[in-house]
Amino acid sequence: MYEYIKGKYIDMYKDYIVIENNNIGYKIYTSGSTMAKLPSIGENIMLYTEQIVREDFIGVYGFLTKDELSMFKLLLTINGVGAKAALSLLSISNVSTLKYAIKMGDEKTITRAPGIGKKTAQRIILELKDKIEIDILEEDDEQTINKVTDDKKVLEAVAALITLGYSEKEANKVINSCDKNNSLEQIIKEALKYLMK
């Protein structure tokens, strides 16, 4: 029903924030990832939203990026994963890291989310692994082209750089320029050497 909401960031609670728009305070449920990136209270923000309506509940969920909102909606398609569990998954890491974990079948990372057990993690991997696309960027003269790869070593290297604080775009670009015949450790070292120049 609502594409996004703009307004003044008023307050933060355990699993939701309050945004004021036209003298109305809106309760917006959100993830830990979005909360961590919010500006100071009192500043204006915009969140992309999804409204969930049940017999006993009506709630609005909001995220700073369309990518996180899309991932939230995708997680809700899994049997046994509700809004609370989806927020929990989006709170343990950024969207990129979660995508890589699903693509690589990394149950350990997924089960770090409170309320997500081994069976649910396996179901998430089984149902979403082939639906998730991960862009590996490479330079091709004047343009950058996107391609999807299932190369586990490359995915692990990119995920490692993201964990170290580099953006998905930076990680993808530098890893794609490394020698893929090297070991995972060598690829990461080569990438870090390039990034630290």
Swiss-Prot record:
InterPro entries, A to Z: DNA_helicase_Holl-junc_RuvA_I, Hlx-hairpin-Hlx_DNA-bd_motif, NA-bd_OB-fold, RuvA, RuvA_2-like, RuvA_C, RuvA_C_sf
Organism domain of life: Bacteria
Sorted UniProt keywords: Cytoplasm, DNA damage, DNA recombination, DNA repair, DNA-binding
Region (Domain I) residue spans: 1-64
Hydrolase keyword on record: no
Record region (Domain II): 65-143
Region feature Flexible linker, mapped onto this chain: 144-148
GO cellular component, one term: Holliday junction resolvase complex
One Pfam family recorded for the sequence: RuvA_N
Main location class: cytoplasm
GO terms, biological process: DNA recombination; DNA repair
GO molecular function: ATP binding; four-way junction DNA binding; four-way junction helicase activity
Residues covered by region (Domain III): 149-197
HAMAP family assigned to the protein according to its UniProt record, in alphabetical order: DNA_HJ_migration_RuvA
Domain free text: Has three domains with a flexible linker between the domains II and III and assumes an 'L' shape. Domain III is highly mobile and contacts RuvB.
Function: The RuvA-RuvB-RuvC complex processes Holliday junction (HJ) DNA during genetic recombination and DNA repair, while the RuvA-RuvB complex plays an important role in the rescue of blocked DNA replication forks via replication fork reversal (RFR). RuvA specifically binds to HJ cruciform DNA, conferring on it an open structure. The RuvB hexamer acts as an ATP-dependent pump, pulling dsDNA into and through the RuvAB complex. HJ branch migration allows RuvC to scan DNA until it finds its consensus sequence, where it cleaves and resolves the cruciform DNA.
Name assigned to this protein: Holliday junction branch migration complex subunit RuvA
